[in-house]
From Swiss-Prot:
Organism: Haemophilus influenzae (strain ATCC 51907 / DSM 11121 / KW20 / Rd)
Molecular-function annotations in GO: ATP binding; DNA binding; DNA topoisomerase type II (double strand cut, ATP-hydrolyzing) activity; metal ion binding
Annotated signal sequence range: none
Cofactor note: Binds two Mg(2+) per subunit. The magnesium ions form salt bridges with both the protein and the DNA. Can also accept other divalent metal cations, such as Mn(2+) or Ca(2+).
Alphabetical keyword list: ATP-binding, DNA-binding, Isomerase, Magnesium, Metal-binding, Nucleotide-binding, Topoisomerase
Top-level EC class as recorded in UniProt: isomerase
Pfam families referenced in this protein's UniProt entry, alphabetically: DNA_gyraseB, DNA_gyraseB_C, HATPase_c, Toprim
Lineage summary: Bacteria, Pseudomonadati, Pseudomonadota, Gammaproteobacteria, Pasteurellales
Self-association state and partner proteins as the record states: Heterotetramer composed of ParC and ParE.
Annotated catalysed reactions: ATP-dependent breakage, passage and rejoining of double-stranded DNA
Gene3D superfamilies for the chain: 3.30.230.10, 3.40.50.670, Histidine kinase-like ATPase, C-terminal domain
Binding site for ATP: 5, 42, 69, 110-116, 334
Protein name as it appears in the record: DNA topoisomerase 4 subunit B
Length: 632
């Protein structure tokens, strides 16, 4: 390692180099299926916009894929600032495309992923043909670099338009260079289901098979076929759709009262969100609100029984498709939606639609209510078997602890909240059934070098240990009182300091909690942005600028509010941004137990927190200080 840290040591990655050096940051490197999905998404976006009616996908024996659509065709004119053709910009520049405004696409799935430029970067060769303006154009790339200039190779009818993308992934970037045919077929069929009237043909030249999908009533037919053979409630799926100003949602739902293999698929702009997200949370909440209202209106609930989302969700099979502008995903591979507004939109639409359906189909509705109530009663019986620590069975619980009612470790959460004022807001914002609040007064003790027998000398840490029901440095979690421990501190530097000290406490003195995945850090927003009737929350300066950039084409002037601390938020804001499972952001505290990674983590923490290593910290700050992100 060099001791001189100068400009010569700084590496600047250009064009597609970041993708080729760190492919795992941009795509799934297990198999190249995600590359195919990116190309297919571009064609499907043309269908969503009303310009394409047919898509053909061919898997060749050499494990290359060819995707053809009859959309508008990629732009071939010269880009005004880049000085090269539009198709070349799209293939060679990260974050380039026609979907960053709503002029070309009302809804688009291709905007928020890695884009076709990453397909180019990770492929041995990419050949593009474009039919546009009555002419056929061709351009080719190898390993991300252009090898054939854009040229006209023929003519076609002026109304004949479209794009052909033929690419062969580079095997060195993937664990297996072979496409998963089953996943590819499932993806294509789902696209056809979700985009009524779109014909999709899949030609598998490896296995010599061919499929054609065209659905006019896609969601209902697809769900019925998926649960074929099982008893369903209702007999025909509960289906519906609704289109708002900037969002549209469609769904199909069935319940399997006698059990069976449940189907749960969600999509955003026809992109499969395998890990769900805020739109699925909204679906759960909408169903819960409607069934609760139905049961209360008809006096169906036994005394002491309160329904939760899991009670109505337990045997539900669903297909959910959301189309929205400015969708935000967690990660480049778009497997989880994180847009907060989608939860509110979907839950509101589903609550109204499901309430109407319940009251129009009373016989089926009462059977559903019976299933949900039975689930709730089973849950309550199971909870009674878990005995909470009482005053007579151990140390008295901290007086400032606002405990929750449930004993279900799958759902209970303890929030460690910075400051009494924020603790007061959190107590009002919480779900009393599942969420407990323990306010902390100021910065806790730095316990990194404190011995286990002395760590409980700190009142704050003693309260944390008693509230959790476990002793420091113990591997016995049998008396653990909460399934999640959530650190909730301000988004400023002081809050980050407190969160760091708490993370150090758990890593050093409660390592079993961390290893078993019980510790989380809440991510409260630093900014609130209001424009007309829309509200957005930004985690940091970069996210604020990204939101403002998206809003600059909308009418009105955004109002930006910076939260100085959690105490500034009213309970409803705190709940929406930080405590509501449907809309909050939580980051799980983990560290790799592997021999190298685990020791590296502990070494870094020791350097940052040990009092005797001030000189090491000074040297580290001198070397890394230019990377700091300061909010002044």
């Amino acid at each position: 390692m060099t001791t001189n840290y100068s400009a010569q040591e700084i590496t600047v990655l250009k064009d597609l180099e970041p993708v080729q050096i760190r492919p795992g940051m941009y795509t799934d490197t297990t198999r190249p299926n995600h590359l195919a999905q990116e190309v297919i998404d571009n064609s499907v976006d043309e269908a969503l916009a009303g310009f394409a009616t047919k898509i053909e996908v061919i898997l060749h024996p050499d494990q290359s894929i060819e995707v053809t659509d009859n959309g508008r065709g990629m732009p071939v004119d010269i880009h005004p600032t880049e000085g090269v053709s539009g198709v070349e910009v799209i293939l060679t520049k990260l974050h380039a495309g026609g979907k960053f405004s709503n002029k070309n696409y009302e809804f688009a799935g291709g905007l928020h992923g890695v884009g076709i430029s990453v397909v180019n970067a990770l492929s041995e060769r990419v050949d593009i043909q474009v039919k546009r303006n009555g002419e056929i154009y061709k351009i080719a790339f190898e390993n991300g670099s252009k090898v054939e200039e854009l040229e006209i190779i023929g003519t076609c009818g002026r109304r004949t338009t479209g794009t052909i993308v033929h690419f062969k992934p580079n095997p060195k970037y993937f664990d297996s260079a072979k496409f998963s045919v089953s996943r590819l077929r499932h993806l294509l069929r789902a696209k056809a289901v979700l985009c009524s009237g779109l014909e999709i043909k899949f030609i598998d030249k490896v296995n010599n098979t061919q499929d054609i999908w065209l659905y006019e009533d896609g969601l209902s037919d697809y769900l019925i076929e998926a649960v074929n053979g099982f008893e369903t409630l209702p007999k025909k799926p509960f289906v519906g759709e609704f289109k708002g100003a900037n969002e549209a949602v469609s769904w199909a739902l069935l319940w399997l009262p006698e059990g069976g293999e449940l189907i749960g698929e969600s999509y955003v702009n026809l992109i499969p969100t395998i890990q769900g997200g805020t739109h699925v949370n909204g679906l759960r909440q909408g169903l819960l609100d409607a069934i609760r209202e139905f049961c209360e209106f008809r006096n169906l609930l036994p005394r002491g029984v309160k329904l939760t989302a899991d009670d109505i969700w337990d045997r539900c099979s669903y297909i959910l498709s959301l189309k929205m502008q400015d969708a935000q995903f967690a990660g480049q591979t778009k497997e989880r939606l994180s847009s907060r507004q989608s939860a509110v939109f979907v839950s509101g639409v589903l609550k109204d639609a499901f309430s109407l359906w319940l009251n129009q189909n009373v016989q089926d509705a009462e059977k559903l209510a019976e299933i949900a109530i039975s689930s709730a009663q089973r849950r309550l019986r199971a909870a009674k078997k878990v005995v909470r620590k009482k005053l007579v069975s151990g140390p008295a619980l901290p007086g400032k602890l606002a405990d929750c009612g449930s004993q279900d470790l799958e759902k209970t959460e303890l929030f460690l909240v910075e400051g009494d004022s924020a603790g007061g807001s959190a107590k009002q914002a919480r779900d009393r059934e599942y969420q407990a609040i323990l306010p902390l007064r100021g910065k806790i003790l730095n316990t990194w070098e404190v011995s286990p027998d002395q760590v409980l000398g700190s009142t704050e840490i003693h309260d944390i240990a008693v509230a959790l029901g476990i002793d420091p440095d113990s591997n016995d979690l049998s008396q653990l009182r909460y399934g999640k421990v959530c650190i909730l501190a301000d988004a400023d530097s002081d809050g980050l300091h407190i969160a760091t000290l708490l993370c150090a406490l758990f890593l050093r003195h409660f390592p079993k909690l961390v290893q078993d995945g019980h510790v989380y850090v809440a991510m409260p927003p630093l900014y609130r942005i209001d424009l007309n009737k829309e509200v957005f929350y930004a985690l940091d300066e970069n996210e604020k600028e990204a939101i403002l950039d998206r809003l600059k084409n909308k009418k009105g002037k955004p109002n930006v509010q910076r939260f100085k601390g959690l105490g500034e938020m009213n309970p409803s804001q705190l709940r929406e941004t930080t405590m509501d499972p449907n809309t909050r952001r939580l980051v799980q505290l983990t560290y790799d137990l592997g021999e190298d990674q685990g020791s590296d983590t502990l070494e870094l923490m020791d350097m940052l927190l040990a009092k005797k290593r001030s000189e090491d910290r000074k040297n580290w700050l001198q070397a890394k200080g230019d990377q700091v992100d300061l909010s002044v």
